[in-house]
């Protein structure tokens, strides 16, 4: 009898725990003051492939790590263009920028060189399996079947939610903002990240 009651109690406790956790996302994006996971990935700058290392980039100053859904799509085009237009201001604050998406390196070679978007100024890294995004607690969004990019080319990869992390040289996250949680527009990801790196450098924030 006591054994049966014990099993019943165990089942009830399991149900309570399950009910308490239902609806909680499998991942939660990293927050301010968390340690930014190090990563290395194939990347492209001005159409040229190279191996990007966050650890190496941080030795030179803060790094803006911005995740975006896909190259050659409306919001991502705006974001890349705005970053490229303000690259000199990030340079003045001693900060570098790396975009990360699930695009193939072939797509990113074209995107990084396109004068309308990255304009040869912004490096973008390929995260085809979403490994980097997952380490930052970001969720995958399935691409709609037959969806095409702004060039009319079918998109063959899933998306990562648009989220930006500002990482300090000691590997800590100084700021983070997302379109999903904070309703930040693609262009405002640039505005906010620029203000964050200028604050780290002790500069007066400027308007992109």
Predicted regions and their residues:
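N-terminal secretory signal peptides that target proteins for export/translocation
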Residues: 1-9
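N-terminal export leaders
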Residues: 9-15
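N-terminal signal peptide c-region/cleavage motif recognized by signal peptidases
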Residues: 23-25
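Chalcogenol-based redox active-site neighborhoods
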Residues: 27-208
């Amino acid at each position: 009898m006591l054994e049966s009651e014990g099993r019943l109690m165990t089942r009830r406790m399991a149900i309570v725990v399950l009910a308490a956790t239902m609806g909680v996302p499998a991942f939660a994006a990293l927050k301010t003051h968390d340690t930014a996971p190090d990563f290395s990935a194939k990347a492209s700058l001005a159409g040229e492939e190279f191996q990007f290392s966050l650890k190496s980039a941080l030795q030179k100053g803060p790094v803006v790590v911005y995740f975006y859904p896909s190259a050659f799509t409306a919001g991502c085009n705006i974001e890349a263009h705005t970053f490229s237009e303000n690259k000199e201001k990030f340079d003045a604050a001693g900060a570098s920028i790396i975009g990360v998406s699930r695009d193939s390196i072939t797509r990113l070679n074209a995107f990084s060189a396109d004068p309308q978007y990255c304009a040869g100024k912004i490096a973008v890294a390929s995260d085809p399996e979403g490994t980097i995004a997952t380490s930052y607690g970001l969720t995958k969004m399935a691409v709609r079947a037959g969806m095409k990019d702004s060039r009319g080319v079918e998109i063959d990869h899933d998306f990562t939610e648009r989220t930006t992390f500002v990482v300090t040289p000691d590997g800590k996250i100084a700021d983070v903002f997302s379109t999903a949680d904070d309703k930040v527009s693609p262009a405002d990801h640039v505005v906010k990240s620029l203000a964050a790196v200028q604050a780290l450098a002790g500069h007066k924030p400027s308007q992109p």
